[in-house]
From Swiss-Prot:
Gene expressing this chain: xpt
InterPro entries documented for this protein: PRibTrfase_dom, PRTase-like, Pur/Pyrimidine_PRTase, Xanthine_PRibTrfase
Name of the protein: Xanthine phosphoribosyltransferase
Signal sequence residues: none
HAMAP family xrefs: XPRTase (MF_01184)
Oligomer and partners: Homodimer.
Domain of life of the source: Bacteria
Function, in words: Converts the preformed base xanthine, a product of nucleic acid breakdown, to xanthosine 5'-monophosphate (XMP), so it can be reused for RNA or DNA synthesis.
Cellular component per GO, a single term: cytoplasm
Gene Ontology MF annotations: xanthine phosphoribosyltransferase activity
Compartment annotation: Cytoplasm
Disulfide bond positions: none
Length: 195
């Protein structure tokens, strides 16, 4: 998605440890017009998947997930990272390691909002090692729902997440594919049909 790549080039910052900081438009300050376009793009890519719900993990995945749900006309569920006083029983859970924060969080989704007939699209802001998506896959397995794919805003192609998900048969659609962050520069992987 060229618009997203341009935004990354303009506002993204490469930090030590192969971290791409995009807090100017995605995971701190949010560009709502870009998020709307991201949601529309995911909806177009998965238009024939008969999606009934969109799932994400709080908090950076919420904006693109909500816009995807809006474009598809389906509800959005975000897996909570912290225990809630109002959601204290009847939960599906999984442990997820955060590459950027170097911590493990237990994510949870209420059984109340999940139906065994659901066809779920997973949305995440980044795909590096695939831990957030893997956690959502574990919850989907516990719930007995079908995952139709994973929509990723920014994929780090030089890390194993996408290949590991593909090996499990998960359809991955990434809007920006970063091939390298070497020397503080963001390089993108060209996709078929691009010059």
């Amino acid at each position: 998605m060229k618009e997203l790549e341009e935004k990354i080039r303009q506002f993204g910052t490469v930090l030590p440890g192969n971290v791409l900081k995009v807090d100017a438009f995605l995971n701190h300050q949010v560009d709502p017009v870009l998020m709307q376009h991201i949601g529309q793009e995911f909806a177009a890519r998965f238009k024939d998947a008969k999606i009934t719900k969109v799932w994400t993990v709080e908090s950076s995945g919420i904006a693109p997930a909500v816009m995807t749900g809006l474009a598809l006309g389906v509800p959005v569920i975000f897996a909570r990272k912290h225990k809630s006083l109002t959601l204290n029983s009847g939960m599906y859970t999984a442990d997820v390691y955060s590459y950027t924060k170097k911590t493990t969080n237990r994510i949870s989704i209420s059984k109340r909002y999940v139906d065994k007939t659901d066809r779920v699209l997973l949305i995440d802001d980044f795909l590096a090692n695939g831990q957030a998506v893997e956690g959502m896959l574990q919850i989907a397995d516990q719930a007995g729902v079908e995952v139709v794919g994973a929509g990723i805003v920014i994929e780090k192609c030089f890390q194993p997440g996408s290949a590991e998900l593909a090996a499990k048969g998960v359809r991955v659609e990434s809007l920006a594919k970063v091939s390298s962050l070497a020397d503080g520069q963001v390089s993108f992987k060209q996709t078929e049909g691009e010059d």
